[in-house]
């Protein structure tokens, strides 16, 4: 039996990060964690491009444009959608997750879902670098592993 998995070495890999400005007090921390994860694993700063979008709903469109360019080994989507008192949360969360998955499948480029979908601000803060670690860092690890796995499958 042969098994295949991606490594966490980022040398010579290119990454795009698409980040929502909405809830920036959370997303800025996710970005810090993401950049830390990539740089700790030998990704050169010159191989990281960061694209800001207004809100989480806009993330899939920019991811699609970047994936179609074939310039990146993986794309990381970062955002924070926090439940309010209207059904808006459900609509945005569902469309963002579906949109990101569709881009990845259609373009055959890993698009990593680093969008927090939380019931409270406290939950989001916990996932952006306090009690529950930093999900931006976790997204970077997934991007590294998937970029290398896809590279291995292609060769």
UniProtKB/Swiss-Prot annotation:
InterPro entries: LS, LS/RS, LS/RS_sf. (2S)-2-hydroxy-3-oxobutyl phosphate binds at residues 85-86, 127. GO terms for cellular component: cytosol; riboflavin synthase complex. GO terms for biological process: riboflavin biosynthetic process. It comes from the Bacteria. It is an enzyme of class 2 (transferase). Keywords: Riboflavin biosynthesis, Transferase. One of its GO terms (molecular function) is 6,7-dimethyl-8-ribityllumazine synthase activity. The active site is at residue 88. CDD domains: Lumazine_synthase-I. It catalyses: (2S)-2-hydroxy-3-oxobutyl phosphate + 5-amino-6-(D-ribitylamino)uracil = 6,7-dimethyl-8-(1-D-ribityl)lumazine + phosphate + 2 H2O + H(+). 5-amino-6-(D-ribitylamino)uracil binds at residues 22, 56-58, 80-82, 113. Pathway: Cofactor biosynthesis; riboflavin biosynthesis; riboflavin from 2-hydroxy-3-oxobutyl phosphate and 5-amino-6-(D-ribitylamino)uracil: step 1/2. The keyword Transferase applies. Its EC number is 2.5.1.78. Belongs to the DMRL synthase family. Catalyzes the formation of 6,7-dimethyl-8-ribityllumazine by condensation of 5-amino-6-(D-ribitylamino)uracil with 3,4-dihydroxy-2-butanone 4-phosphate. This is the penultimate step in the biosynthesis of riboflavin. This is 6,7-dimethyl-8-ribityllumazine synthase.
